[in-house]
Structure formats: C-alpha cells, structure tokens
C-alpha cells in the first residue's frame, strides 16, 4: 500500500496499547478515527465515512490480526469499518470459508472507496493483481491448479 499512497504510516508489532504515536493520533483525532476490522453485526457506534481522516488497518493473517486486536486494548473503543454486503475476494491463492474474507489490501481498498469516493484506487488493485500473478508464477501452474483453482482442481 505504501507503494501507492504517500500518506501512510506503518508500525510493526503485536501489542500497540502503549504505542505513543498511535495513541497520540487516536487521542488527538478520536472523532475522525476508525479501525478496519470485521464485526459480526453492524454496531450502534458508527462513523460516517466522510468523517474518517485516519484509518487504522491491522495487516496479517486472520489469527494474527485477532491477536493484535486482542492485545491492543487502545483499539477496542474505536468505531469499526466492516463490510456486510457480500464481497468476493480476488485473492486467487488464498482459500477461506468465511464470508467477506478479504485480504488486508482488498479490505483497505473497499474502505478507501467509501471514505474517499474520488480517490483513484486503481493502482492499488493493479499492484494486488500483479502480486498474485507473481506468486502463482513462482509456485507453478500445477500447484496453483491443484491447491487453489477450484474450477480446474476439482476435476
């Protein structure tokens, strides 16, 4: 994502509860902050997309993202952006039985489309597609077909 947008900050870790920079951003901009994180049902505490100026994204596997969220108690009170309409993932090398199980990049892209409708996110989508093509190329067509291509792999 940092290849496509210049107003992005990346922090690495598992527990951001005491992370000074993140806490300063949350405290100074609370009415304009949202967390991109799945919820089971729409919550009562919502934020209009146009009000969001800071979007916090947890990037990792589902298990890792859950752990980061669980440990980072400073994120628990933030309003969340979740998707309740059915969205099909384009991540062809990932299989998940969960509804709306988008990659972090896909979910961020969808969130940005809601937050900033005039923002051109095509570069992000193209980068994502190239990354997938590269990974398929490296694993080989046979492995891709066997493990991920449901149309061909089920023959």
Where are these regions (language model features)?
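S-adenosyl-L-methionine/SAH cofactor-binding core of RNA-modifying enzymes
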Residues: 4-70
